[in-house]
Amino acid sequence: MPDESIAFQTASEHSNQISYNPFRTNHKGKSVSLLKKLPKPMLPDETRREIQARESYHVLKIISEFVEAGEELRAIQPAVSIYGSARTPENHPDYEFTLRLARKLSDAGFSVISGGGPGIMEAANKGAFAGASPAVGLNIVLPHEQKANPYQDLSIKFQHFFPRKVMFVKHAVAYVVMPGGFGTLDELFESLTLVQTGKTPNRPIILVGGDFWSGLLDWIRKELLGRGLIAAADMDLIRLIDDEDKIIEEIFAHYENRLETLGELGADTWSLGL
């Protein structure tokens, strides 16, 4: 991570050196001025430069999180990311299901990636920690500190959600989504969007808990598909499987099929999740 004082000073100096050019090229290739449309600044120039410098510093920190996390996560592939609620208690059936699934995935040769916190995240790490492959936690620093669970062979701390979510997607060959709240839904739809738009290759997105997910899936079919906002093929991106052994079979079948394309794709680790 870059030294904060040095990085901020560098960003501040860079901000002071920038001279704003109000002329831009429009879609017709003509040079146009934005001055007539730009609002009058509400803050003094010095204050705005300081804010810009701090924003530049945050960009540097985000880049450093990408680089550092990427280097560490290369060693743990292939991996499966498991999403789910931080509030699920240890005696809940979803916790116990996740614990068993993660252990089986770990013994089958897949590292297991979770958010590193309590609840479903803890169950995923705990199951993998007892198995043959690494348990990985992608921990996030929050205003109300998320306590990292103790079942992590590799623990990576993030200040920003953006690089953390990318690491969940980039370094996994499949995504298992347990019941959860806003954070889980965010991770689910992030994965769906990246696969749907081709920004990441097709990988299994497996929902666990028919009773929990059926209402959302019905709404997606009725409102999104029914209004033509998604294609019928987009529904095939989601699998609903409540049996842990069938989940592993689904992941293995997809992973082995992907390995057959290794010769065609060469060293494209993003495409293969390797």
Residue ranges of model-derived segments:
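N-terminal amphipathic/basic-hydrophobic helices that include classical n-h-c signal peptides
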Residues: 1-25
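Glycine-rich beta-alpha loop segments
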Residues: 18-40, 45-138
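Solvent-exposed alpha-helices and their adjacent loops that cap or buttress functional pockets
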Residues: 73-75, 104-106, 128-129, 146-150, ...
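Acidic/glycine-enriched connector segments
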Residues: 119-177
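Short gly/pro/ser/thr-enriched loop/turn and capping motifs at secondary-structure boundaries
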Residues: 141-147, 184, 212-215
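Active-site/ligand-binding-proximal alpha/beta "capping" segment
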Residues: 159-211, 255-260
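C-terminal functional extensions of proteins
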Residues: 207-274
